[in-house]
Amino acid sequence: MAAKSKTPPPVDSLTRSQARVEHKRLALEIETHNERYYQQDAPTVSDATYDALQRRLEAIEARFPDLVTASSPTQTVGAAPARGFAKVQHAVPMLSLGNAFSDAEVAEFVERIRRFLKLGADDMPAIVAEPKIDGLSLSLRYENGDLVRAATRGDGFTGEDVTANVRTIADVPHKLNGHNIPTACELRGEVYMLKEDFLALNKKQQEAGDTVFANPRNSAAGSLRQKDVSITASRPLKFFAYAWGEMTDRPAETQNDMLEWLRDVGFIVNPLIQLCHSVDEVLAFYRRIGEQRATLGYDIDGVVYKVDRLDWQERLGFVSRSPRWAIAHKFAAEQAMTILRGIDIQVGRTGAMTPVARLEPVTVGGVVVQNATLHNEDYIRGLGNDGQPIRDGIDLRIGDTVVVQRAGDVIPQVVSVIIEKRPANAKRYEFPDRCPICGSHAVREEGEAVRRCTGALICPAQAVERLKHFVSRLAFDIDGLGEKQIQEFYDDGLVMHPVDIFTLQERDARAENKLRDRDGYGDVSVRNLFAAIDARRRIELNRLIFALGIRHVGEGNAKLLARHYGSIESFRSAMTEAAAAQTEAGNDSEAYADLTNIGGIGDIVADAVVEFFAEPRNVKALNDLLEEIEVLPVAQARSDSAVAGKTVVFTGSLEKFTRDEAKASAERVGAKTSSSVSKKTDLVVAGPGAGSKLKDAEKFGVKVISEDEWLKLIEG
């Protein structure tokens, strides 16, 4: 570690805020040195330097005792860095909000509340209005005032445990201050990044040759989910608190007073929040925030309105996955004019060639936009997907003045051309008939708007994206082998095909330059990587089929194919037969007919699967892979179970299953699952926090059972 030229200020001169920031920095620095010393046997500082860091941390904690935590280096030694995220069930689901896009919809939201609560025509419920931060939702659990767990929102019911990472965020108190602290509580808010910090981070990433982030929200989310906690600590993350979940003793009776309480216990609450007493006040706040939007230091994508009285919130309850007592008033899509400087082609995992506009940089909604999607070649020509004219049939040309639109998280897009400003030298764009990456022919299938590269596995663009898909969560899901590592290994020629992942350890043993000698690696991380790869040498058939990256074959279709064929041998044999017959005699083979007769698999999916197996290089890649892995046959669903053939809906927070595991348990006993309750539903399995689906079950006369009853039913 390079010596710092500037002497830090004396501890006695630090303010509490300065001390808190330095305390976190010192704790992370010491933990990093502990890891290098205790885990890697590779210290990078002298004992004297390490002792000086430790003494300064102790001095800060002596002056500010409330900064001491159980995880402080003064209390423990050498905690290992996070290597993955455990699942966390939210005690109270983190639901989404309904949206309003007009003043009339906001007025109707207030009117619905008034009707539901049976208020008089002149009675206006007080409404708390607050900016809608464009970040990552986070739930913080405190017990006896101490932060014990932090979790991302996830699917609303199950999130990722990011406690170690969150402890590095200066805005998140490790201990709640003051009085009136509940025994247990879940406090919630948004992790975000300031615009100026985002730009500085991207500049640093670019200079280091690392991936840059698309926007502040993505950078905040990516920074929080780092497996190396020191990376999170190095990122300038912020946190606004604005809500809560489970709480043993609620300290206030209104939304506004709860926000004040959050401030009192140590959180930063957005200062722009306002209590409104009329629809006019609410809409005036919305317009004022909209006018300030570009000057704020952080991204917002609307305004959130919440009923102030908490007892009214409880009476109003929830509908579907959102509360009746709150709504998000989204900003209208924002537009700006700029110059179209060029058009590039991006090649995706399936070979889809997508045109991207390169624009003169322009600020749209407070965000600098330099690129925008152009969808496909018809869009450039002024035609929609139905072949009908769009933009009055005006094509896009290099040099045109165009209108760019950005709406929320949607990728910026070119929506119109200012034809009056078209220069005489504006250049027509000719869509390429060859892949710009590998030079293979690009073809456009009948009825499709997309042109695709036919290079398959020989196209570097597709190869990298296919490999990233291969290791994705629903496919092989190899811990420690994510998109960054795949790109790095591909660039260095270590992993060019799926099978290379499973021969990596063998080749590394023979290599002169070992993986452990690379930047960011070491003996421990390499051992863990190889162990994670070995753990995936046995995989379910549906995961393998999904991992192949066949067009139109997502998670659901992969399961349908796996259930039908049962084993990789049957699947491979049938598809090879269908592919051979397609070459010789069209699509009249018995194997093809069997494929199209699978419920849910139509001609489009069937053709895509057969086309995959008709490419010899794809078959070779699969055969090579099967030499290294074992594909588990599909367990046949029980036909003798009490729920065989029944339709089951799971709702609420499940304690013994994740949602995916619950669905799998139903499928194993021959049941079907659905996401909604209807007349066709046979059974609802309800956990804590179940909402409207229980009412629907009562409405349709559907039997409701608990999770424990479900377990007894399927195990019987």
Curated annotation (Swiss-Prot):
One of the Pfam families matching this protein, by short name: DNA_ligase_OB
Binding site for Zn(2+): C435, C438, C453, C459
Alphabetic keyword roster: DNA damage, DNA repair, DNA replication, Ligase, Magnesium, Manganese, Metal-binding, NAD, Zinc
The enzyme's E.C. designation: 6.5.1.2
Catalytic activity: NAD(+) + (deoxyribonucleotide)n-3'-hydroxyl + 5'-phospho-(deoxyribonucleotide)m = (deoxyribonucleotide)n+m + AMP + beta-nicotinamide D-nucleotide
Tree of life domain: Bacteria
Cofactor: Mg(2+); Mn(2+)
A GO molecular-function annotation: metal ion binding
Coiled coil, from the record: none
Segments forming domain BRCT: 638-716
SMART domains: BRCT (SM00292), LIGANc (SM00532)
Record-listed NAD(+) binding positions: D47, A48, T49, Y50, D51, S96, L97, E130, R153, E190, K306, K330
InterPro entries in the cross-refs: BRCT_dom, BRCT_dom_sf, DisA/LigA_HHH, DNA_ligase, DNA_ligase_AS, DNA_ligase_CS, DNAligase_adenylation, DNAligase_N
NCBIfam families the UniProt entry points to: dnlj (TIGR00575), PRK07956.1 (NF005932)
Free-text function comment from the UniProt entry: DNA ligase that catalyzes the formation of phosphodiester linkages between 5'-phosphoryl and 3'-hydroxyl groups in double-stranded DNA using NAD as a coenzyme and as the energy source for the reaction. It is essential for DNA replication and repair of damaged DNA.
Protein name in the entry: DNA ligase
Protein species of origin: Nitrobacter winogradskyi (strain ATCC 25391 / DSM 10237 / CIP 104748 / NCIMB 11846 / Nb-255)
Gene label: ligA
